[in-house]
């Protein structure tokens, strides 16, 4: 599920998505891969990938 709890695999997964520069594992037991847009501003985090259903949930 998008590599979490391994930050490196999550980051690589996010970089493969157009418009995303990376990602990190967070949430309960670090099982959620959160991707961020290029620019690195915290409020630009948009897509959250959950290891349980592997679907993107739009935050906005």
UniProtKB/Swiss-Prot annotation:
Abundantly expressed in hemocytes. One of its GO terms (cellular component) is extracellular region. Gene3D superfamilies: Knottin, scorpion toxin-like. The keyword Disulfide bond applies. The keyword Secreted applies. Induction: Its expression is increased by bacterial challenge. Pfam families: Defensin_2. Its main location: secreted. It is found in: Secreted. It comes from the Eukaryota. Belongs to the invertebrate defensin family. Type 2 subfamily. The Cys-4-Pro-5 bond is in cis conformation. This is Defensin MGD-1.
